[in-house]
């Protein structure tokens, strides 16, 4: 059975559904304390810092976006006030009609140049707060499908440091435009548009990415996005592109012609489940420093050709599921692949059901310990060159040739291949004959 999601992370494969990120999740508000309740939220006991509770209190304040709400003063102790870094002492009565389909957003200023930092001992919780026509910055971008906001204009007119999780799971937003972008020192954009499943248009022409180091999951699960032009991106300092476009299942065109990947070390699941992508040009990619490519093209079921002849894989150790479930793939060019440091090729070509020829005579597999299901489901494969396969370190090889043609297996048996591979083929042929 073919998997629906790529299950490969930086540390290997998992049998559970793919969930590469674990940002702060919604939970219920903690029980009311003896200090009482203000604005529907429990107060913190005097002199104590309830780390996780402070998060829920803050979220509760801004959560109800569709009704008239009076936000009253909440008496935080000094320690909590210092940690939250926002002024919550003077709120006015606020009424929101919520009929507008376009909202202009602006980050909330604080001395750290961040949106919010709840507690440094926990994962930093970033969310932008936007202005209404009264300039009261009290609403979050945690928007769901039943909310009416569909278009957002962003104005960044002062320095901020991180956009991590900025629009995380904003499922209702269809269009985002960065109208003004202050030249800044932003270093993080991981999960920035993660889960924006209604997003069809995004204008990044004013984007400044000069100092960004992390773009992991940046467009993950933007399942309605059809086109993406990142021609102006400066990626000189980026080291992590893990799952950057994972789950962009409607994406048919992506321009990466100016991508600088010189410093990238992680490309795992980068194009995972880009199932509508029919062509991808990575001829300018520099992969000299990449160490993991696991699941990089997993589930790219519309790709028919992949040319990676320019790829330098000298430092790559993990190729788990790299081309798994590329079910339309007919041609793949890996002539320059150096696999001398690779230890895991599990699922590497799993489910490549249209692939007819595969020449791997340049593969150095002396350090590979797992080849399980490597060619499983390659049901159209009629030519496979494994003449230089060194299986001396292989510990796992179960399912390696499952669902391959009998003719291919018989042909391989006649070739000069390792005794481990011959034994594996003999066992499989005996099963097929019985």
Regions found by a protein language model. Name each.
Residues 1-186, 388-390, 402-434:
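N-terminal capping/linker segments that flank leucine-rich repeat
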Residues 10-13, 29-31, 35-37, 210, ...:
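Acidic, Ala/Val/Gly-enriched low-complexity intrinsically disordered segments
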Residues 11-14, 30-32, 36-40, 213, ...:
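Intrinsic disorder/low-complexity segments
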Residues 11-22, 216, 224, 246, ...:
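Serine residues within intrinsically disordered or low-complexity segments
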Residues 45-48, 67-74, 90-94, 150-159, ...:
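Structural signature of tandem-repeat unit edges
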Residues 168, 191-195, 217-221, 243-247, ...:
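Short beta-strand elements of solenoid repeat domains
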């Amino acid at each position: 059975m073919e998997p629906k999601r790529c299950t490969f992370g930086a540390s290997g494969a998992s049998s559970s559904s793919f969930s590469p990120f674990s940002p702060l999740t919604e939970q219920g508000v903690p029980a009311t304390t003896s200090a009482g309740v203000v604005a529907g939220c429990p107060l913190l006991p005097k002199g104590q810092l309830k780390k996780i509770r402070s998060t829920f209190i803050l979220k509760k304040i801004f959560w109800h976006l569709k009704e008239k709400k009076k936000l009253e003063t909440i008496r935080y102790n000094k320690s909590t006030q210092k940690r939250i870094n926002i002024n919550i002492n003077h709120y006015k009565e606020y009424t929101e009609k919520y009929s507008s389909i376009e909202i202009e957003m602006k980050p909330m200023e604080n001395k750290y140049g961040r949106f919010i930092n709840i507690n440094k001992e926990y994962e930093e919780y970033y969310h932008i707060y936007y202005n209404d026509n009264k300039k009261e910055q009290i609403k979050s971008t945690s928007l769901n499908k039943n909310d009416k906001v569909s278009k957002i204009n962003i104005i960044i007119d002062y320095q901020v440091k991180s956009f991590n999780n900025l629009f995380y799971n904003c499922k209702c937003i269809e269009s985002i435009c960065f109208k003004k972008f202050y030249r800044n020192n932003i270093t993080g954009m991981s999960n920035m548009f993660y889960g924006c499943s209604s997003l069809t248009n995004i204008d990044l022409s004013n984007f400044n990415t000069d100092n960004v180091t992390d773009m992991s999951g940046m467009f993950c699960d933007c399942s309605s996005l059809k086109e993406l032009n990142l021609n102006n991106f400066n990626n000189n300092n980026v080291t992590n592109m893990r799952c950057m476009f994972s789950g962009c299942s409607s994406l048919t065109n992506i321009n990466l012609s100016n991508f600088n990947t010189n410093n990238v070390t992680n490309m795992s699941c980068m194009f995972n489940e880009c199932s509508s992508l029919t062509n991808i040009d990575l001829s300018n990619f520099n992969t000299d420093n990449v160490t993991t490519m696991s699941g990089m093209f997993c589930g790219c079921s519309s790709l028919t050709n992949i040319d990676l002849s320019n790829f330098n894989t000298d430092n790559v150790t993990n190729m788990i599921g790299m081309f798994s479930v590329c079910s339309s793939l007919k041609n793949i060019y890996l002539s320059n692949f150096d696999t001398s440091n690779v230890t895991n090729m599990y699922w590497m070509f799993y489910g490549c059901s249209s692939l007819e020829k595969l020449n791997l005579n340049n593969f150095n597999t002396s350090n590979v310990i797992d080849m399980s299901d490597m060619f499983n489901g390659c049901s159209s494969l009629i030519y496979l060159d494994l003449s230089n396969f060194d299986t001396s370190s292989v510990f796992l090889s179960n399912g390696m040739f499952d669902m391959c043609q009998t003719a291919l297996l018989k042909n391989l048996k006649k070739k000069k291949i390792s005794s481990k591979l011959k034994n594996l083929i003999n066992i499989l042929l005996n099963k097929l004959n019985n």
